[in-house]
Structure formats: structure tokens, C-alpha cells
């Protein structure tokens, strides 16, 4: 039954607009059947993840065909980047964070800086980043984790379903951010 549930949710997440009514039951069942221990799954956690579904109503947490909503996780470096890649030639919006692994499933998040990352012009890539003064503690519970799928719950109760993007390189996406 387990592999079928993973296949079902991955197939749903590859649809243009996955529906909550389809995702939530599988989300809950996988959380129950396959609990995560982040400390033992650092290799699975590391990499580029694409947000494919969220329970949030925030526009930047919705799946849009014109927007790549990526999260680059580098737990060995205690760093992460949330990256909204806008259509060319607009560049993207990035937020850099420091991570603190808190086993078994919690990751503490401290946002450091964020802003606009422009498109590349030859060797030059303009950016406008500013420091962030985080007023509240933030965290993410990684509840299910494989090398293909990550299910998480945010500190505000939001559910997130992400698929791993093996075709994207963490170094290329983060090189201009001076992590």
C-alpha cells in the first residue's frame, strides 16, 4: 500500500493545480505510516525542492504555471533559500535563512536577508538584498521525506507538499547569494 500512496501523491503533485480534497487524505496517511527523522535523512533533505501544493491562501504559496517556487536546502551548511523564479527577464525573489536541525522532524528557521535577484547580464547579475529582522520564531516540521517527496507543516499550520528537482543545481541557484 505504501508505494502506491507515494505514487498517487506524486502523480497528483505533477498536475497543474493539485486539489486539497485529493492531497490532504494522502498527506495524512503518509504522515502516519512514514514518519520522518530529519537527522537520519540529511541526504534526502539536501537539494532543490519545488513547492507543488500548499494549504495556504497566500499568492506566493500557490502553484502558478508562470512561477517556479523553489526551496534550496543545504542542512550541512545550515542554510536555505526560498526562491521565487519569475518569468524572464524579471529575475526572482530570494530569502536566505539559517537552519537549525531539531530532531526528530523540526527545523528551526531564522530569516537573514531577502530581496530581488536580477537576470544575468554576461558575468553580472544585479541584486538588491536587505537584512531581515525576524520578530518571531519560525520552524518547519518535515513529516514525510524521501529522495522525491517532502511533506511539511509550517509554524503557522500551513501544509506543504514539495517534489525534489534533481535537474536543478544548488550551486547554480545560490552562487550570487553569498551563503
Features from the language model and the residues they span:
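Soluble ligand-binding/transfer domains with enclosed cavities or grooves
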Residues: 2-179
Amino acid at each position: 500500500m505504501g508505494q502506491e500512496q507515494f505514487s498517487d501523491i506524486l502523480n497528483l503533485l505533477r498536475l497543474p493545480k493539485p486539489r486539497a480534497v485529493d492531497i490532504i487524505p494522502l498527506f495524512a496517511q503518509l504522515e502516519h505510516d512514514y514518519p520522518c527523522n530529519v537527522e537520519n535523512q540529511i541526504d534526502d533533505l539536501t537539494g532543490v525542492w519545488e513547492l507543488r501544493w500548499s494549504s495556504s491562501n497566500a499568492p506566493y504559496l500557490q502553484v502558478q504555471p508562470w512561477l517556479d517556487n523553489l526551496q534550496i536546502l543545504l542542512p550541512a551548511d545550515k542554510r536555505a533559500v526560498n526562491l521565487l523564479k519569475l518569468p524572464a527577464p524579471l529575475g526572482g525573489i530570494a530569502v536566505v535563512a539559517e537552519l537549525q536541525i531539531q530532531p526528530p522532524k523540526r527545523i528551526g528557521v531564522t530569516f537573514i536577508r531577502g530581496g530581488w535577484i536580477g537576470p544575468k547580464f554576461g558575468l553580472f547579475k544585479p541584486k538588491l538584498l536587505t537584512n531581515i529582522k525576524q520578530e518571531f520564531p519560525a520552524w518547519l516540521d518535515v513529516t514525510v521525506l524521501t529522495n522525491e517527496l517532502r511533506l511539511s507543516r509550517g509554524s503557522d499550520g500551513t501544509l506543504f507538499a514539495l517534489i525534489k528537482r534533481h535537474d536543478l543545481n544548488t550551486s547554480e541557484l545560490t552562487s550570487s547569494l553569498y551563503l
